[in-house]
C-alpha cells in the first residue's frame, strides 16, 4: 500500500541551545516545548 504525500502545515524551526553541563538546557527546552504545545494545540513528545 502506497503512503500518501506528507503535507507540512506548520513551519519547521530548528532551535539550538549552548551551555555548560548541568545548567538546565534540557529542562528549558522541555518547558518551552510543553508550553508551546499547549498554547498552539500541539503535542509534546518525550
UniProtKB/Swiss-Prot annotation:
Keywords: Cytoplasm, Elongation factor, GTP-binding, Nucleotide-binding, Protein biosynthesis. GTP binds at residues 19-26. Disulfide bonds: none annotated. InterPro entries: EF-Tu_GTPase (IPR050055), P-loop_NTPase (IPR027417), T_Tr_GTP-bd_dom (IPR000795). Residues 1-20 are annotated as: Disordered. SUPFAM superfamilies: P-loop containing nucleoside triphosphate hydrolases. Residues 1-10 have a biased composition (Basic and acidic residues). One of its GO terms (molecular function) is translation elongation factor activity. It comes from the Bacteria. Transmembrane segments: none annotated. It holds the Pfam family GTP_EFTU. One of its GO terms (cellular component) is cytoplasm. It is found in: Cytoplasm. This protein promotes the GTP-dependent binding of aminoacyl-tRNA to the A-site of ribosomes during protein biosynthesis. Belongs to the GTP-binding elongation factor family. EF-Tu/EF-1A subfamily. Monomer. This is Elongation factor Tu.
Amino acid at each position: 500500500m502506497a503512503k500518501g504525500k506528507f503535507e507540512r502545515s506548520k513551519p519547521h524551526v530548528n532551535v539550538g541551545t549552548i551551555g555548560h553541563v548541568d545548567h538546565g538546557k534540557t529542562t528549558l527546552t522541555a518547558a518551552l516545548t510543553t508550553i508551546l504545545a499547549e498554547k498552539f494545540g500541539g503535542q509534546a513528545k518525550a
